[in-house]
């Protein structure tokens, strides 16, 4: 099942990487080193440390692309070239003086694309190509709006003319594309190609004259669209964060400020070698670890407080925090949007959920409750830790702040029916070793063994175990049944022994 959740995230701001607040694009070399086009130069990140490299005659770097031999091509204001490792260090080689005819200005480089070893530089109005030995300007069929690498081919969008494909050193018009709005991504799908426009309208290659989906209201303005390795699509917007779509173009997840990412503005997205996402924001960079099997469930999805307990019961997930109980239905697929709902009446510290057969109980600082579908039924007023099943289906044992008590079900209602005498200790953890031997472990006083008869009455004096009987100390001793055997854990060891 998939629940509404937040990926683990690392945020990097200008203080971390010592550059400008805005970042524009990413790429990664064969060794996993990340490169970032930043307002103050080229950033390099090895997973631990950031480095910044200035580009001569330019402050901003808008485009970055790793080419052959791990050369890192960059484009800035009236500057193009590449960085590479030499005996002198990570050095920059400019290509601007090699451009024929030598222009006085090429303005800013907005995008860099690599196809079959050739490097294409997309300026504000023209296209340059470097083949490894020379750089030249290509004759564009018009005013250049955007460029894309699609199915290992170069595609241009020309203002008021549509899309053109670069074939055999020439540009060939793609019919039916004249009326397309500004495109930010052309991505492969299962049976066709998907065109994402800046205004949020999505087209398919087999019906370019008719919008397939209008996401203009949800998305607003789109800045970036990429296909992920699992077949999903990641969409970065100007004012509404990051969306993940499945191959059917249905929204799976939505991350925005205070809900998964650190900003509403996403300038670009990059999936790295580990299938995680680097997100360029209006202020800094987020690293979303979406490939991990772990995620966060916190205030951003409606769960307030520190987590203490979790339980899956009757197709619902119950989360217990120091602020109460939060619940959500389990889904085969995540519906968007989806958040946890606070369980009314559960305000305060939750310690545990105890399931006995087909009933779920809440162990709470305020006492013990039975959890019904949409309500709580209180039946004990002393702060409660845990319940344990007995041989009698109508009797349960409960550990609370003042000892161990029995509860009996009468006419469908649970009522206190007795208690273990001579035990006034807070009974945090209960575990049956067998039908007649119950262990209780205390947070800082050690372990207690109780021998009970069939009526849950003491047959022997309660035995106390702690440091004096072989435990490393009396602190944080717990008991568990592991593979059918009783084991104890302490603050230092796991102990497999019988006393």
What are these language model-derived features?
Residues 1-499:
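Carboxylate-rich, polar loop motifs that coordinate divalent cations or form catalytic acidic clusters
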């Amino acid at each position: 099942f998939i629940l509404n959740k937040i990926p683990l995230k690392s945020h990097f701001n200008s203080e971390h990487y010592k550059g400008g607040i805005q970042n524009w694009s990413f790429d990664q070399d064969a060794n996993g080193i990340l490169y970032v086009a930043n307002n103050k130069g080229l950033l390099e990140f090895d997973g631990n440390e950031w480095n910044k490299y200035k580009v001569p005659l330019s402050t901003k770097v808008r485009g970055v692309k790793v080419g052959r031999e791990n050369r890192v091509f960059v484009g800035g204001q009236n500057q193009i070239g590449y960085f590479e490792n030499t005996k002198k260090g990570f050095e920059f080689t400019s290509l601007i003086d090699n451009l024929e005819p030598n222009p006085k200005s090429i303005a800013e480089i907005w995008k860099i694309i690599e196809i079959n070893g050739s490097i294409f530089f997309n300026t504000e109005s023209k296209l340059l190509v470097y083949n490894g030995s020379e750089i030249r300007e290509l004759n564009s069929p018009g005013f250049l709006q955007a460029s894309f690498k699609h199915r290992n081919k170069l595609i241009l969008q020309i203002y008021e003319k549509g899309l053109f494909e670069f074939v055999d050193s020439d540009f060939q018009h793609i019919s039916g594309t004249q009326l397309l709005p500004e495109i930010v991504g052309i991505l492969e799908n299962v049976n066709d190609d998907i065109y994402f426009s800046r205004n949020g309208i999505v087209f398919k290659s087999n019906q370019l004259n008719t919008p397939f989906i209008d996401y203009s209201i949800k998305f607003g303005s789109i800045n970036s669209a990429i296909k992920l390795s699992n077949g999903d699509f990641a969409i970065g917007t100007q004012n509404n964060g990051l969306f993940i779509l499945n191959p059917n173009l249905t929204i799976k997840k939505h991350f925005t400020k205070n809900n998964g990412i650190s900003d509403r503005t996403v300038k670009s997205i990059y999936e790295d070698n580990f299938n995680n996402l680097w997100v360029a924001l209006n202020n800094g960079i987020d690293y979303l670890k979406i490939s991990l099997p772990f995620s966060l469930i916190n205030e951003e999805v409606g769960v307030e407080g520190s987590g203490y307990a979790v339980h899956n019961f009757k197709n619902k997930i119950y989360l217990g925090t120091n602020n109460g109980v939060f619940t959500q239905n389990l889904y085969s697929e995540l519906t968007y949007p989806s958040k946890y709902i606070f369980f009314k009446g559960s305000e305060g510290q939750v310690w545990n959920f105890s399931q006995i057969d087909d009933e779920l109980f809440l162990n709470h600082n305020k006492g013990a409750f039975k959890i019904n579908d949409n309500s709580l039924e209180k039946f004990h007023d002393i702060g409660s830790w845990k319940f344990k099943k007995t041989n009698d289906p109508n009797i349960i044992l409960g550990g609370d702040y003042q000892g161990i008590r029995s509860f009996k079900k009468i006419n469908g209602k649970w009522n206190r029916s007795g208690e273990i005498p001579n035990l006034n200790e807070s009974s945090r953890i209960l575990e049956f070793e067998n039908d007649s031997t119950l262990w209780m472990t205390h947070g800082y006083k050690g372990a207690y063994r109780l021998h009970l008869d069939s009526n849950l009455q003491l047959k022997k004096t309660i035995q106390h175990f702690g440091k004096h009987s072989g435990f490393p100390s009396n602190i944080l001793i717990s008991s568990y049944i592991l593979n059918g055997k009783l084991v104890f854990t302490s603050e230092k060891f796991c102990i497999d022994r019988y006393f």
